[in-house]
Design a protein with these regions (language model features):
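Conserved structural motif at the start of ABC-family nucleotide-binding domains
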Residues: 8-10, 23-25
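Short coil-to-beta microelement around the adenine-binding A-loop and adjacent beta1/P-loop entry
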Residues: 20-21, 80
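The feature captures the beta-strand-to-loop junction immediately N-terminal to the Walker
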Residues: 39-41
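ABC ATPase NBD Q-loop/coupling interface
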Residues: 65-81, 146
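ABC-family P-loop ATPase nucleotide-binding domains
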Residues: 94-168
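Walker B catalytic motif
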Residues: 174-175, 182
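Conserved beta-strand-loop-alpha-helix hinge in the C-terminal portion
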Residues: 219, 223, 227-250
Length: 265
């Protein structure tokens, strides 16, 4: 009996920039339908990990592998990884004046899932349902991509793309930053809708446990100085909220004073 490979499997990943090491041997496995959280303070390597999975050319991998459904993707260009099923939501999405949201969504879905997936009544029903779930008015489709969007609108637009494209792997980098509690609940609802019970998987990168109160992760991983030093269930996120990160710094290494709070951005 064959067993499907994990959606994402990272083995002994070492990477850096300009001969400066940032990731120092990461191992991570995410199965289909699972949501994992990668937590850590600023500078721990979380966003670097996301960029390397997506293929950012600025970073160099010196050792290890990154597999998507059993296929090593490290030699792929970023656009090839996107077409293979990797989706990255950005902390600071760029505005594209002149490109309407509706056209952008249709082209994106067609590029990943084929032309037939981006036309006809089924696509329109899916789009209408996803926008309703995210409390987005139909007039949003006529606006230009991220042009004049509020922080909350940018985040909801990222999740709308996720819900329509249905990637194999969604990497959500600081999706909860700048959102109030209602915005977090709305975004979390979209993430759950896109991933739970599907063949997709998600990696949520965050400092705090706010969004994890509404998107219950299957596993939580703590990244410190480029290494995953602890993994656990959702209760680990709550423990970090109470205790911060200092207690997880390996003995003999410098400790930087930082406390994780529910309100600090």
């Amino acid at each position: 009996m064959s067993v499907d490979p994990p959606v994402l499997e990272i083995r002994d990943l070492h990477a850096g920039i300009d001969d400066t090491p940032i990731l120092n041997g990461i191992d991570l496995k995410i199965e289909s339908g699972e949501i994992h959280a990668l937590m850590g303070r600023n500078g721990s390597g979380k966003t670097t990990a996301a960029n390397i999975i997506m293929g950012h050319p600025e970073f160099e991998v010196s050792k290890g592998s990154v597999e998507l459904n059993g296929e090593d993707i490290l030699e792929m260009k970023p656009w090839e990884r996107a077409r293979a099923g990797v989706f990255l939501s950005f902390q600071y999405p760029q505005a594209v004046p002149g490109l309407q949201v509706g056209n952008f969504l249709r082209k994106s879905v067609a590029a990943i899932n084929g032309e037939d997936a981006a036309k006809g009544p089924e696509f329109r029903r899916t789009l209408k349902s996803a926008m309703a779930e995210l409390d987005m008015p139909r007039s949003f489709l006529g606006r230009y991509v991220n042009d004049g969007f509020s922080g909350g609108e940018k985040k909801r637009f990222e999740i709308l793309q996720l819900m329509l494209i249905k990637p194999k792997l969604a990497i959500l980098d600081e999706t909860d930053s700048g959102l109030d509690i209602d915005g977090i609940k709305t975004v979390a609802k979209g993430i759950n809708s896109a991933v739970r019970g599907s063949d997709s998987a998600a990696l949520i990168i965050t400092h705090y446990s706010r969004i994890l109160e509404h998107v219950k992760p299957d596993r939580v991983h703590v990244l410190i100085k480029g290494r995953i030093v602890k993994s656990g269930g959702p209760e680990l996120a709550l423990e970090l909220e109470e205790r911060g990160y200092d207690w997880l710094i390996p003995s003999g290494e410098d400790s930087e004073s930082e406390t994780v709070t529910a309100t600090k951005d």
